[in-house]
């Protein structure tokens, strides 16, 4: 019996050579004191059960922590784990990212790096609040104020951590190694203190400021959003059908009169009729030509039902390029007629300052509303003629350009709706209506007052809230901003220090987003989040603003810390809001410093993760300085405008360096219907069902081998996951089973060795070296897709070439002198190396195989294989690869001709440059292809007919009329080739002027990659007899397997043929030894007999009639 390994043995050591034998060496005993399975390695693995056993072992053994502890003092590879929300169960998108977060840290650990993997939870913001509202039955923000912020925020806190246990179970079942025990939460006071420190740093640098801007605004959640939140996911913009209106604005005043435009009706188009009550200006383009068009013979649409002459004879102003689009509305029968009716044109710049008749009088009182400069035409370059009328209605509270242009003209920003987007009392006609409800009554008013020229439905892509999914509005709000535009160029420069996968994201989606980055709105009118640490005086006569960046600063000024009900420091509302003090700048002592009510954008929390997770700068300053930037992060492509962007922005602003140096920005996981995975649609396989049926390694392989890590999208299907089982898991396990089966049969415990001189062994070892080099390069480049492809190809080579072609050597076993051990040692060496190379991508199954193969503690505690320890043999690899390619082509020709492989053929002919190099492998080709002879012909085209085709279009310009002579010469065969130069009809042809093609006349011939291959398929009675004999051998092997015999069990064999012709044909097969091939001590052709009998029907093989195989196991005592 082989002695057990000591637990103190270094995990990365390899077993030394052994001469000891035992009856069944494999699986080897493990160092943890557990006995190996009593049964041999199963040929029918249930991978989910194997995985559960491995997970239990890891938990018992503490393998994950050992993988980190073993690398103490080693160089570190820093990984930032983007925190998820735990108020919902993970889906395939999370699993996809989670696998990537495990593959590369595992790989780097095996490469000798120390890789800590600290898990974190994103907890603040709308995701938590919306879930709390749902659970509490809250439908309006006012209900939160009524119940009290402490109770609401506690409910939000409880909801956001609701599924942490389930998340841990999913992550663990993924075989993803993370440190949950030392995880962080963005709601932790230590984390939040680092966040407010960051805000103060930005404020002190002049990069945080308060402003009044038009922002995307969610009326359901009553808070503004940042522009980047609208660009993270494709489904933020959804197709929506709205009513558009084209409205008339009659020109008035002295300038209109001087231009001869008095009473001309300006046409303005809008997709948001609800903004018309706050129309305060119109804008034209300076270089756009505007046309005056009289009402047509059919009458303009705004005059219908109003027959007075003044109305019917009205004139209209719009961009001349768009007149045809309004022909019908203006009363013309065709666009041409409308354009022909234009009476004059005027450039936009000349219209500046012309006043017009406002729609309604809601804000006519200039003393109250400051509208003394309103209702005039302004000029700006943002106006185009792509749609509408070329004249833009301005509501400065509801459009970014509107606000910019109007403020420059001294026109005020007037808010007409409340926080829930309901109209305020000033707009009497629709007061109390929500903006999307107010469209119809407003349009009705416009029609009744003769101001509506056109109403139409308009389908367009419209932004929706990324959390509650309601349509957004744009609305001017008071907000705090990060002045991103001040350091935008620096962000662009630092981006060049980052390696992106896929590479095009650097200067594509991410780079372009950086180049156009705008100031970031970071304040939210909500409750559960990190506070904006700004206190203001409540008396404008004594203004003062204080910004705080630590608990110590708060305690210094307020005399106490913000404490929750448990008496713990807590920066959440309402505890931090309770901190007030007299205004030091108010000599009267009556004003008070109060915190502004807003909280920070949840993305500010996420972007602070690198330093906030360790409470920097209050603790761990040295640690952070040495662990930033990170070596690796990974998330889906949407985070290029989300987490990746905000990490980069805050790191640039605070530390003037990137937050990370390598990043994977993977594609999106789609459901089986091609849509994003959706719980409501149930368009993806249940995760737990896949774990239970196929296992985590199969799912990991499916996701990590797909193009999704290169930025493509991936459709999740059950068949796709199962394909990973077929492609890699089963071939790997089958090779391990094959090795253990024959090693146990011969009682040999293999050793690591690369000394074999056998050509297949040398080839396999050299290919293993190539594999190690290739996978190392791929994983260094964060390309698991290519690495997986290399492993998949190697698995095919291992099982379908090496193992299949080496069966006889393993069957022969190892004798008492050690002869025959080379094959076992080679396959042991390759399996041990392969399981290490595949470990990051198949961590569970490789763990089981490696442990049972080596007796070691864990494959994940070993070092990554060193390719230099394996022999290189480029010439052998090139030659054998060529042999395999020839074999593949020849086998496809067999299949095409309907000739089974067990039927021998007369010969194979191979014509190729360097054919002589294949001579040492003739025996392999004969055996692989079951041919009697292999004919190797030197020269790429020797003995192969070829046809020359002249390209007249390319040759004609060079030789003119002679081209026809050359074409005739090519067709008649009057051409030659010497030293790569083709001559036809006496003319030397240049590359690109001709094509040479091999003429394939034989039905079982093919020309591929410069090699001509032809099979001789003529059959003789002897060849057919040998084919039947090999069919019989296959039938006997099937019978042995059905009888449950071991690979070394000897038998007595009886064959009974219903058709005498089959027996006579079999008698001609003098070259096939059925007895030795089937381990039969005796072979008889007689009546069916034996301990186990199996009948094969006529035509099942090449047999004419039924035949029966009878076998009886011969016990050792009987021999």
Swiss-Prot record:
Enzyme class, first EC level, given as a word: ligase
Self-association state and partner proteins as the record states: Monomer.
Chief location category: cytoplasm
Pfam families: Anticodon_1, DUF5915, tRNA-synt_1
Localization per Swiss-Prot or TrEMBL: Cytoplasm
Swiss-Prot/TrEMBL keywords: Aminoacyl-tRNA synthetase, ATP-binding, Cytoplasm, Ligase, Metal-binding, Nucleotide-binding, Protein biosynthesis, Zinc
Residues forming coiled coils: none
Function: Catalyzes the attachment of isoleucine to tRNA(Ile). As IleRS can inadvertently accommodate and process structurally similar amino acids such as valine, to avoid such errors it has two additional distinct tRNA(Ile)-dependent editing activities. One activity is designated as 'pretransfer' editing and involves the hydrolysis of activated Val-AMP. The other activity is designated 'posttransfer' editing and involves deacylation of mischarged Val-tRNA(Ile).
Superkingdom field: Bacteria
InterPro entries assigned: aa-tRNA-synth_I_CS, aa-tRNA-synth_Ia, Anticodon_Ile_ABEc, Ile-tRNA-ligase, Ile-tRNA-ligase_type2, M/V/L/I-tRNA-synth_anticd-bd, Rossmann-like_a/b/a_fold, tRNAsynth_Ia_anticodon-bd
E.C. no: 6.1.1.5
Flavoprotein is among the record's keywords: no
Entry's family note: Belongs to the class-I aminoacyl-tRNA synthetase family. IleS type 2 subfamily.
GO BP terms, alphabetized: isoleucyl-tRNA aminoacylation
Region (Disordered): 1-43
The protein's name: Isoleucine--tRNA ligase
Domain notes from UniProt: IleRS has two distinct active sites: one for aminoacylation and one for editing. The misactivated valine is translocated from the active site to the editing site, which sterically excludes the correctly activated isoleucine. The single editing site contains two valyl binding pockets, one specific for each substrate (Val-AMP or Val-tRNA(Ile)).
GO molecular function, one term: ATP binding
Motif ('KMSKS' region): 676-680
NCBIfam families noted in UniProt: ileS (TIGR00392)
Names of required cofactors: Zn(2+)
Residues that, per the record, bind ATP: 679
